[in-house]
Amino acid sequence: MQMRQITAGFVGFGEVNSPRELIERKCQRARAALEEAGLRLVYTAPVSDDPAGIAEQRARQELARGDFDLLVVCLAGWIPSHTVIDVISPFAHKPMVLWGLTGERVEGRLVTTADQAGTSALRDVMDGLGFRFKYVYDTPEAPYAAASQVVSFAEAARAAALLRQSRVGMMGYRDMKLHATLFDGLSLRRVVGTEVEAFETLEIAQQMEQVEAADVAPLAEVILTEWHFDQPPQVAALEQGIRMYLAVMQKVQERGYQAISLIDVDGVKKLLRFPPAMVFMLLADKGGVATIPENDALGAVTQLMVRYLTGQAGAYFEFYEFMQDRVLVGVPDYVPSAVVDGQVKVLMAKFGELSQGVLNVSRVQTGQVNLCRLASRGEHYRMHIVTGQAVTPGVWEEAGWAQPAPRLPSLEVILDTPVEDFAQKVLGQHYILSYGDQRRQLDDLCHLLGIEVI
C-alpha cells in the first residue's frame, strides 16, 4: 500500500555558552540525515537558554504553524532542562524523540558539548511528565547513526496517527461463538483509536441481488486472466462471489473502512451456502483493504498496525502444528496476492458439506518473517511478536477435503525463540505475517500506544 510521507517537527538545543556555530552545524547535520531518510521536517533554529526566553518563544511559534506526526527534540549539547520543557510542553500530545548528538574528533581529540549531560538530565523528567517519547543517542564512533532509530520511531508515530482515524467493518458478530476474536469497543478506541462497526449479513445479501449482470462479467474476465485455475471454471460459478465482493465494496466505500472481517462459518457458508475465499481475495487485491475471516476484530486491528508500519499486506495465517523448532502456519481459504510466490493459483474444491467454491492454493513467499497478534484482557492490551525464517513446508493436508486434498497456502516458520516459549504466550489462532525484521517498529508502536509487548 502507498504510505504518506512522514512529517516531523524538529527543534535543536544548545547552551548559550556553547559555540553557536557548532550547535547549528550539528543540528543541520542531524536535519540532513532525517531528510535524506525521507522525512519532511517542520524546522526551527536551535534554542539556547537566553535569560529573556526569546528563542523559546520563537521556537514555539514556528513549530505551532506546522502539522507534524512527531517532534524531534535534538540536543546538540548541554542545556538546562527547563528550557527544553518550556518549548515542548505545548506539543505534549505529540509523540517525541529525545535525540542526543555526540562530540566530534578534531586532530585526535574528542571535542564535546556534553550532549548526554543534557539528555540524561531530561530522560527521567520527560518520563515523569508523561511525554510519550523514545530516547536515542549517538556515540563519537558513530555520529548521527541514531537517525535510523528516529526514522523507525517516526514510522510508528505515523502508524499511530493513522490508527486514530481507522475504521474496521465487520459483517455479523462472533463467528462460531469464538472467544479469542472478541473485543471491547471502548477500550479499543481509547488505546488504539480504531472504531469497529458491525453491519448485517442480510444487508449484503440484499445488495447482492441489486448488482447488475453487466458489472459481474468484466470482473469475471479479469479473474480468469489473472488467476490460474486447475480447470476452466464456468463464469456462473464465480458470479455469487463477485456479487458479494461488489456489495461489500459498496459498504467499504460508503463507510470508509480500511479493514473488513466477515462472519464466515456461521454466516456466508451457513446462510449463503458458499465459501467466501474468493470474496476475501477480491477485497484484498482489488479493494485494497485488510481482510480476515471469522469476525476477528483484533486480528483486523493487528493487520492495520502492520500495514501502517510497513506498507505490506499483513496477511493472516493460523496455526496447524507446533513442531520441535518451528510452527506450521496456513490458511484454509485464501492469501492476498502480495504474499504469493508467482501467479495466484486457485481450484474449485469441496470441503465437508459445503458446495464447491474457489479455494486459493498459491505458493507463499518465504524468507525472514514476523508473526504478531494483538489481544486484550479488560483494559490491558498485549502484543505478542515473534520472528523467524519461513520456509516451504513439507507435504501435508487438512482432513476433511475431498480427495485428492488441496495443498493449502502455508509456511513452516523456524522461530528465533524456543517453540515452548512461543506456545506459552500464544494469544489466538490467527497471527499476522509481515516480511523482513519489523520488530523495532512494532515495539515502538506498542510503546507509543501503551501496549505491553510479550
Residue ranges and their predicted role:
Residues 222-309:
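Long, internal scaffold/assembly segments composed of regular secondary structure
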Residues 68-77, 97-99, 257-262:
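Periplasmic-binding protein-like
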Residues 87-113, 121-127, 132, 281-295:
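Short, acidic/small-residue loops that bind anionic groups at enzyme active sites
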Residues 356-454:
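Extended hydrophobic packing segments that form well-structured cores
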Residues 1-35:
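N-terminal basic/disordered segments at the start of proteins
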Residues 3-8, 41-42, 104-233:
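Cap/lid and interdomain-hinge subdomains that line or gate substrate/regulatory clefts
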Residues 55-68, 85-88, 245-254:
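Short, well-structured alpha-helical segments in soluble
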Residues 287-399:
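C-terminal catalytic subdomain
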